[in-house]
Amino acid sequence: MTTTEFPSAVAKARFVRVSPRKARRVIDLVRGRSVTDALDILRWAPQAASEPVAKVIASAAANAQNNNGLDPATLVVATVYADEGPTAKRIRPRAQGRAFRIRKRTSHITVVVESRPAKDQRSAKSSRTRRAEASKAAAKAPAKKAPAKKAPAKKAPAKTAAKKAPAKTSETSDAKGGSD
C-alpha cells in the first residue's frame, strides 16, 4: 500500500482542563472528516469536550490557510488525538476525618489537517452505495430457478382408537330374553 504525502498543518492545545478519555469520545466523531463537517458536528455535540476540540480544529484550519496557503474547502482532519496531561490533585473532606482525593485531569489535544484533492466520481461513491447498486442490478436480472424440491411422501393415517359397536349375535339376544 502506498501512502501519499498531502500538504498539512498542525495545531495543539496543551493543558486543556478536560479528561483525555472524554476528549477522545468527541475526537472519534470527527476523525477523517472534512473540517467544515467536523466543526458542524462539534457545534451540536452535547459533550463539554466538543468546545476545546472544535477550537483546535479551527486553529489548525487557520494555520493551514494563513501559513501554508491551503484551500480551506479541501481540508480534512487527518490526525487528531488527545494525550494525557498533568493531573492536579485536590482533597475532598469526608466523614470521620477521612479525605478522598479528587483528580483534575488535563489533556494535550493535537490536530493535523491535510489538503486532499477532490475525489473523482467513481471513488466519491461510498462502498455502501456501490453494493446497493450491485444488489439492485442482481435483483433486476432474471433469477435462475432452483431445482424443484420433491413433494414429501404422504404419511400413513394416524392410528385412532376406533370404538367398534358390539356385533349382534344370537347369543346376546337370547341372554337378554329376546324372542327368535
From Swiss-Prot:
Positions of region (Disordered): 111-180
Compositional bias of kind Basic residues: 142-166
Keyword entries, A-Z: Ribonucleoprotein, Ribosomal protein, RNA-binding, rRNA-binding
MF (Gene Ontology): rRNA binding; structural constituent of ribosome
Basic and acidic residues bias: start-end ranges: 171-180
GO cellular component, one term: cytosolic large ribosomal subunit
CDD domains with a match to the protein in the record: Ribosomal_L22
GO BP terms, alphabetized: translation
SUPFAM superfamilies: Ribosomal protein L22 (SSF54843)
Domain of life, source organism: Bacteria
Family as reported in the entry's similarity comment: Belongs to the universal ribosomal protein uL22 family.
Subunit structure: Part of the 50S ribosomal subunit.
Function, as annotated: This protein binds specifically to 23S rRNA; its binding is stimulated by other ribosomal proteins, e.g. L4, L17, and L20. It is important during the early stages of 50S assembly. It makes multiple contacts with different domains of the 23S rRNA in the assembled 50S subunit and ribosome. The globular domain of the protein is located near the polypeptide exit tunnel on the outside of the subunit, while an extended beta-hairpin is found that lines the wall of the exit tunnel in the center of the 70S ribosome.
Protein name as annotated: Large ribosomal subunit protein uL22
Native species: Mycolicibacterium paratuberculosis (strain ATCC BAA-968 / K-10)
Designated gene of the protein: rplV
